[in-house]
Design a protein with these regions (language model features):
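Beta-strand-rich modules
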Residues: 15-28, 96
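Beta-sheet repeat architectures centered on beta-propellers
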Residues: 26, 45-47, 208-211, 218-222, ...
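Recognizes extended acidic, P/S/T-rich segments that occur
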Residues: 67-115
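Short loop/turn segments that connect beta-strands within beta-propeller blades
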Residues: 153, 193-196, 237, 287-289
Length: 451
């Protein structure tokens, strides 16, 4: 019992306390606290020596520079560690003589641990991948089935409480408008929220798996990736197969090898590179362009693109290009040449109610110079016509190789007669180094002239 005023004051000022310290990088990034020291009794005004603090950085490759020391302080309801002082990394011991009421802010980094790393004893699914910036300074990443979020504006701090486990294995993540799109090996998810403590994760009602993490691209207002059925677009809570009216799932799998697709953003368009097993191919897709939006490209780079970056300052796509042997890496500007490359466009299948004879094909292009414009027509899956149109002034010339070869024939307009035959399913393919405005087939020449 305290029987005098002086003894009563000493009882109030005596307190049980302990210390922790944190590492701080040269950039001000603070880590989680050390284990607490042995509890001791401290009286205000008493000097305590703090010793045994680590001074080496061998356990971390994070450019550590300082240590922050905190002391426990018990209030009326809770006990918190409060700031005492900051010392250099090389300091192994220091002293503390602060009174309780002189202690500063409560330690903020109690739960600020690093993201999952490659220590499989702690993280069996491996290190965190897919670092993505969200709104309000939050970063997201994933490991296995777990989606992780950082503290706002602190990309080094990833509390365990901010990690959510999904039902599906995560393949990749990207922003899709105002939400985070989570592509998986099964059904995709979205995550939305302004605070990592209250993130909402929703499973979408569409079984569209992501076949390759490198196919997922943030297009600004939506995310696009390669699924088994075609290119899929995700915006908000909506998900759509964008190429459904252009390419059938069977064509998509057979011609574009979606599990190999690497995607890039170029001037609002999705650029894809794929690998057939023996050669590289590419395509360009404008999701706002309707039925004329999908164009194949002979090649994306001189060799093949290993990676790429869209520069927001000039809206250009820069590719890391490798030659066919896998060496001689260089950076190339996509579409940086003044010479047009050959483009190829093939329509989707036109299925007629009954077998019909389509007798003419028309190709309207900006120019027909050089190697001209080649047009192929397919009937019921078989190539029935192959010809090339060139022009000199207003006079056109056509040469062909199907159904049989024919030499240069002068024509007055870019309309060609097709071989006789009836078919129920038609497809048309055009290629050339000039802008092609229109391609159509019809039963009569007057029908095409009227278009």
């Amino acid at each position: 019992h305290c029987v005098t005023r002086r003894q009563r004051q000493m009882c109030i000022r005596d307190s049980s306390t302990s210390y922790v310290y944190t590492f701080v990088s040269a950039f001000g990034e603070e880590g989680p606290p050390s284990p607490a020291s042995t509890v001791l009794t401290k009286v205000d005004g008493q000097t305590v020596t703090i010793s045994g603090m680590d001074t080496a950085t061998s356990k971390s490759n994070t450019n550590l520079a300082n240590k922050r020391i905190y002391r426990s302080n018990t209030g009326s309801n809770t006990t918190n560690f409060q700031f005492v002082k900051e010392v250099s990394l090389a300091t192994a011991s220091t002293t503390d003589n602060l009174n309780n009421d002189a202690l500063a802010e409560i330690i903020p980094s109690t739960y600020w641990i690093a993201p999952p790393d490659d220590d499989t004893s702690t993280y069996p699914n491996g290190q965190m991948l897919g670092l993505t910036a969200m709104a309000n300074g939050i970063f997201a990443g994933f490991s296995g089935k777990r989606i992780c979020f950082s503290e706002p504006f602190l990309p080094h701090a990833w509390p365990v409480a901010y990690r959510i486990t999904l039902e599906e294995e995560i393949v990749s993540i990207a922003m899709a408008g105002q939400v985070l799109f989570i592509a998986t090996k099964g059904t995709p998810y979205i995550a939305a929220g302004t605070d990592p403590q209250s993130m909402s994760v929703i499973r979408m009602e569409a079984a569209q798996a992501c076949l390759n993490k490198e196919s997922l691209v943030d297009m600004g207002d939506l995310a696009i990736y390669a699924s088994p059925d075609g290119l899929v677009g995700a915006s908000g809570s909506e998900i759509t197969v964008l190429t459904a009216g252009l390419i059938t799932p069977k064509q998509w799998q057979a011609q574009f090898y979606p599990s190999t697709i690497k995607g890039f953003l170029w001037q609002g368009k999705y650029i894809g590179q794929y690998y057939t097993g023996s050669a590289y191919g590419a395509f360009m897709f404008d999701y706002r362009g309707g039925k004329n939006s999908f164009t194949t490209i002979s090649s994306l780079a001189t060799g093949h693109a290993q990676g790429g970056f869209t520069d927001p300052d000039d809206n250009e796509l820069y590719l890391i290009d490798y030659d066919s042997g896998g060496g001689n890496a260089q950076v190339e500007l996509f579409q940086g040449s003044t010479t047009n490359t050959t483009q190829t466009f093939k329509t989707s299948q036109f299925v007629l109610p009954r077998p019909t004879s389509m007798n003419f094909v028309k190709v309207e292009a900006e120019a027909y110079s050089g190697s001209g414009i080649t047009v192929k027509v397919f009937g019921d899956g078989t190539e029935i016509f192959d010809a090339t149109i060139t022009a000199s002034g207003s006079v056109f010339s056509a040469t062909g190789s199907a159904p049989t070869s024919f030499s240069a024939t002068t024509i007055m307009e870019p309309i060609l007669r097709l071989p006789t035959g009836v078919h129920k399913v038609y497809e048309v393919e055009v290629s050339g180094a000039h802008t092609i405005n229109e391609v159509c087939i019809g039963e009569s020449i007057d029908e095409l002239r009227a278009i």
